[in-house]
Amino acid sequence: MAKENSGHHHQTEARRKKLTLILGVSGLCILFYVLGAWQANTVPSSISKLGCETQSNPSSSSSSSSSSESAELDFKSHNQIELKETNQTIKYFEPCELSLSEYTPCEDRQRGRRFDRNMMKYRERHCPVKDELLYCLIPPPPNYKIPFKWPQSRDYAWYDNIPHKELSVEKAVQNWIQVEGDRFRFPGGGTMFPRGADAYIDDIARLIPLTDGGIRTAIDTGCGVASFGAYLLKRDIMAVSFAPRDTHEAQVQFALERGVPAIIGIMGSRRLPYPARAFDLAHCSRCLIPWFKNDGLYLMEVDRVLRPGGYWILSGPPINWKQYWRGWERTEEDLKKEQDSIEDVAKSLCWKKVTEKGDLSIWQKPLNHIECKKLKQNNKSPPICSSDNADSAWYKDLETCITPLPETNNPDDSAGGALEDWPDRAFAVPPRIIRGTIPEMNAEKFREDNEVWKERIAHYKKIVPELSHGRFRNIMDMNAFLGGFAASMLKYPSWVMNVVPVDAEKQTLGVIYERGLIGTYQDWCEGFSTYPRTYDMIHAGGLFSLYEHRCDLTLILLEMDRILRPEGTVVLRDNVETLNKVEKIVKGMKWKSQIVDHEKGPFNPEKILVAVKTYWTGQPSDKNNNNNNNNNN
């Protein structure tokens, strides 16, 4: 009996030792695993080096080709898919011809000539067909320099970056732009503000409240070099300035080089690419838009994008025609007839004329359509539109009717819901969400999104330190959703163009504008309406997953390269499989890139790709040199 107990004791002891050994080994495995994950999750120092190779004077280095190679990037993988090497060779993209250095794919003059001149259709967006697509890198001009930092950029730009003196000659009297040695200077003048944009805006502020936070978003039609928008920024008003690519060379390019929001666009046959009720203020200073023609169609479009209670400001012909008619080289009768026609259209839209003083005339859109509907019952033209597509604006034809406002029973209520004053507006729950117009979105989810973006921006500052140092002025978010990225960036000296893809499941651009932010619609299978090298940073979350079955991802990346300035930064969020595809493409585009972990850690399937476009410039080809020699002969 004792012998049996002794054997049992030894067996128990052996089991205990074995269990202790297993637990010990397991514990060590877990410890090393956690330590490894923690170590790998720290941000490699080389990521910081990615984004800070800014050349203080690129023109002093070789203008040929490329900046010095950055430090070798450390790639620490936390996903087996990331470890798979591909035997496929990287495709390296060649620079395009130097003559394409200002190429705008969907506003190409040669292509535009094929289209009808009626209602400026030939200057609208007309994108290249398949055999016209470019698979090359748009080159910067030979002596391209990194632009001035904001706020100095408001007043100065390098001549080598936009080598066009036409505006400085053509608009010399109007003080738009001056050439001073190797740079342009922007004195802040304009056709209708000879005392400068600042003084002009002060004149407006004496007539309507500009500084109480009620006016935040503005649209400037036919913007010139965007001095109006540039000086509104001092008043915390964010203007989207637009002008066509036309005889006034590079207006929008100058605006963006200054660090002022702008986009290529025109009042033509289609709606502007913005949702209904987007802007608190619309402005036209001698913008040459025929407001009175086509039954007032263009003013109906202004009415669509104006917020209830928003203002329309007009200066220049025909306003104050009694003083200026001789200088405008038009008859008094002609100018009076034009102004009367504009007054009639404004009245038919149920607008109220606020004032006309000096060179300024201001109208206000009603808060709601309660009274307007009563007027329209008598068949007064134009009617209120019957279709319910007020926010639809991508390649959508203009309509000769008044866009209906959301229903309200109280004549003192703002249709669609009142907005908070700025800056509270940025983080207040937008009325479109309160009213339930965005599927599967409510106030709680909106607030959660704001918290998510606080965490993401904190992470971005670690992997892109320049983000908090004022390095990036012009920023684009290619898939903006609710505008959380832009709202979280408000503390920095930057602005964000929030792009909502027309293919996105939720169309949220109206929400973005209700937050006091700006943006536009876009199909990323096409080119964006901007000049090359106009953005310092591009952000995109989930964009390539959205488009990978719709169009060639290479074309989207080449378009990003066209838009991005040399030494600009790209931050992409997506699943690791998609980012691996993207990184393989960008390695052939003169970009330095690295995939890093999600802010939640290495086990999240979503990763972040950080890339920097290297500095390089175009060079005249032998063919171009020969052509120049022949021209000189």
Curated annotation (Swiss-Prot):
Gene3D superfamilies: Vaccinia Virus protein VP39
Protein name according to UniProt: Probable methyltransferase PMT17
EC number: 2.1.1.-
Signal peptide per UniProt: none
Ranges facing Lumenal side: 40-633
Name of a matching Pfam family: Methyltransf_29
GO molecular function (one): methyltransferase activity
UniProt superkingdom: Eukaryota
Stored InterPro entries: Put_SAM_MeTrfase, SAM-dependent_MTases_sf
Gene Ontology BP annotations: methylation
Stretches that traverse the bilayer: 19-39
Compositional bias (Low complexity): 59-70
Membrane topology (Cytoplasmic): 1-18
Family: Belongs to the methyltransferase superfamily.
Localization in the cell: Endoplasmic reticulum membrane
UniProt keyword annotations, A-Z: Endoplasmic reticulum, Glycoprotein, Membrane, Methyltransferase, Signal-anchor, Transferase, Transmembrane, Transmembrane helix
Residue positions the entry lists as glycosylated: 87
GO CC, alphabetical: cytosol; endoplasmic reticulum membrane
Region feature (Disordered): 50-71
Membrane topology: Single-pass type II membrane protein
Lineage, broadest ranks: Eukaryota, Viridiplantae, Streptophyta, Embryophyta, Tracheophyta
